[in-house]
C-alpha cells in the first residue's frame, strides 16, 4: 500500500512539473512577434546525422496563453519562455518569414536562420496570420 501511494505521488509530481508555466510569455511580447513577422504559430525540428532532434523550437500565440520553447542539443542550449522567444525571434530576423514563399525556400531559409547547414531532416509547421497552416517535411 505504501509503495502504491508513493508511486501515485511521484506520478502527480511529474505531471505537475510537466504542466508548469515555464514556457509562458507575456501577451504583449507574443503580440509583437505576430505584428512584426505575421506568425501566430511556429514549430521546427531539425535532425542531423548525429541526432534526430538536434534542434527544436516552437512559438505559439493564443488569446489565453502564449508559449515559446527552444532546444539546441548541438550547442547544449535549452530555453523556455522569454529566453526561448528571444532566440526564436533572432532566427525570424534572419528568416524574413513570408507566407507566400515556396516550401523549398522556407526550408532553406529556416535551416540558415537556425544555423544548421548539415541537416538531414527538417519538419516545419508555420501559421501566418490570415493564412492556413503549412506543414513541411524535408529529408536529404
Residue ranges and their predicted role:
Residues 1-24:
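Sec-dependent N-terminal signal peptides of Gram-positive bacterial secreted proteins and lipoproteins
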Residues 31, 81-87, 137-140:
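Hydrophobic transmembrane alpha-helix bundles
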Residues 112-136:
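Short, exposed beta-strand-loop hairpins at the edges of beta-sheets
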Residues 6-7, 29-40, 111-118:
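Short, surface-exposed loop and linker segments with low hydrophobicity and enrichment for Pro/Ser/Thr
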Residues 17-31, 73-82:
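Short N-terminal secondary-structure initiator segments
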Residues 21-66:
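N-terminal export/targeting and maturation segments
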Residues 47-49, 60, 127-131, 139:
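Solvent-exposed coil/turn segments that connect beta secondary-structure elements
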Residues 52-119:
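Mature extracytoplasmic domains of secretory-pathway proteins
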Amino acid at each position: 500500500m505504501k509503495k502504491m501511494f508513493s508511486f501515485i505521488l511521484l506520478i502527480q509530481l511529474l505531471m505537475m512539473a510537466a504542466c508548469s508555466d515555464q514556457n509562458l510569455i507575456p501577451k504583449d511580447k507574443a503580440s509583437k512577434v505576430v505584428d512584426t513577422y505575421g506568425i501566430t504559430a511556429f514549430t521546427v525540428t531539425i535532425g542531423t546525422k548525429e541526432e534526430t532532434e538536434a534542434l527544436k523550437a516552437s512559438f505559439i500565440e493564443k488569446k489565453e496563453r502564449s508559449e515559446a520553447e527552444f532546444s539546441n542539443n548541438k550547442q547544449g542550449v535549452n530555453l523556455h519562455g522569454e529566453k526561448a522567444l528571444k532566440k526564436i525571434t533572432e532566427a525570424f530576423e534572419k528568416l524574413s518569414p513570408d507566407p507566400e514563399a515556396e516550401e523549398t525556400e522556407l526550408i532553406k531559409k529556416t535551416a540558415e536562420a537556425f544555423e544548421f547547414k548539415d541537416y538531414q531532416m527538417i519538419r516545419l509547421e508555420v501559421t501566418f496570420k490570415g493564412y492556413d497552416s503549412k506543414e513541411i517535411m524535408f529529408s536529404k
